[in-house]
Design a protein with these regions (language model features):
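Cap/insert and terminal regions of metallo-dependent hydrolase folds
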Residues: 200-209, 214-313
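Binuclear metal-dependent hydrolase catalytic cores
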Residues: 1-206, 283-320
Length: 320
């Protein structure tokens, strides 16, 4: 399994010389796995990084794109109207995301692509989109099989399948499950309903978790610990340093470097990649937040882990 970052900036895109190392596109990640069907690409979020990602997918001849949405703030959706694949009607685009206030993926796309905000109404391109609302985060599991593609199961059916190896009512065997990419979900601490995704590549045992747009908490809830536990790579929101957060950013729904380090240590994650870099942060400030994470680990009994902390950068590829 491998991940490529196409957008690691939070809140708004930036473009200035002082951000050239980590980049300025807003959130978009691509996941590579042998569990994906041939000709299929798996993405997380559709910030401005979706535009270069879509260009790469077009060059590869990708025929189906699965996009998992964490939530619908502008910095996670602004790539949709400008991505080439929005207009390629011979490519299927499947969008999965939470539903809140009556708004799921379809309603979000209808809203951001309509007059007077955008010249192309979503109805004109919707025929090759498939929109799926995830209404029970924590009670659903996505399973992607290389031959059968994605399906969403209830947690009880998924656990029954794991325990008994019976196809039952879900139409999937235990053997097929072990050939699949399993994606679990957890609700983050953020002003709107936001989803963290855990990716488990069953054939290799590799695990990655993306925890973006998540606020610091005094303690780690058991559900969150279990969601992250044993991850080979944790990509986590570390938008602020501690002084910024305490001065004026608490309650914004984002985290700090020292908190991300604590999550890494307490859940046993092997590596930690910071993401959702603040738009005001130059490269040296992003690196300073990494240093803050490393210092926390050294001061709290995990010095060996300090060197496994880094900041994600646009166009970076990470083997898991």
């Amino acid at each position: 399994m491998k991940v490529k970052a196409y957008g690691t900036r939070g809140s708004s895109p930036v473009a200035r010389p002082q951000t050239s190392v980590f980049g300025g596109n807003t959130t978009c990640f691509r996941f590579y796995s042998d569990c994906l069907p041939s000709g299929t690409a798996l993405l997380l979020d559709a910030g401005s990084g979706l535009v270069p990602a879509s260009r790469d997918l077009a060059a590869e001849g990708i025929r189906r794109i699965l996009i998992l949405m964490t939530h619908y703030h502008h910095d996670h959706t602004q790539g949709f109207p400008l991505a080439p694949h929005t207009y390629f009607k011979d490519v299927t685009v499947q969008v999965y995301g939470p539903k809140e206030y009556g708004v799921g993926p379809r309603e979000m796309l209808d809203y951001i692509m309509q007059a007077p905000f955008f010249p192309v109404d979503f109805a004109r391109v919707a025929s090759h989109f498939e929109c799926h609302a995830l209404e029970n985060i924590g009670c659903e599991v996505m399973v992607i099989h290389p031959d059968e593609g994605p399906r969403v199961l209830r947690v009880d059916d998924f656990e029954r399948l794991q325990g008994e190896g019976s196809a039952g009512v879900v139409g999937l065997s235990r053997a097929a499950l072990e050939e699949s990419l399993v994606i679990r979900m957890h609700k983050t601490v953020h002003p709107e309903y936001t989803v963290s995704y855990r990716f488990e590549e069953r054939p290799t045992g590799k695990v990655m978790v993306v925890l973006t747009d998540h606020e610091n908490t005094d303690s780690l809830p058991l559900d969150l610990r279990n969601h992250i536990r044993g991850a080979d790579l944790l990509v986590q929101d570390a938008q602020y340093d501690r002084s910024q957060y305490e001065a004026s950013r608490a309650g914004f729904g984002h985290g700090t470097g020292d908190y991300a380090a604590r999550v890494m240590k307490e859940t046993g994650a092997a590596r930690l990649g910071h993401t959702h870099h603040d738009p005001s942060a130059d490269d040296d400030q992003v690196e300073a937040i990494v240093a803050e994470s490393r210092a926390w680990l050294r001061s709290n009994g995990a010095p060996a882990r300090a060197e496994n902390v880094f900041a994600c950068a646009d166009y970076q590829e990470i083997e898991i």
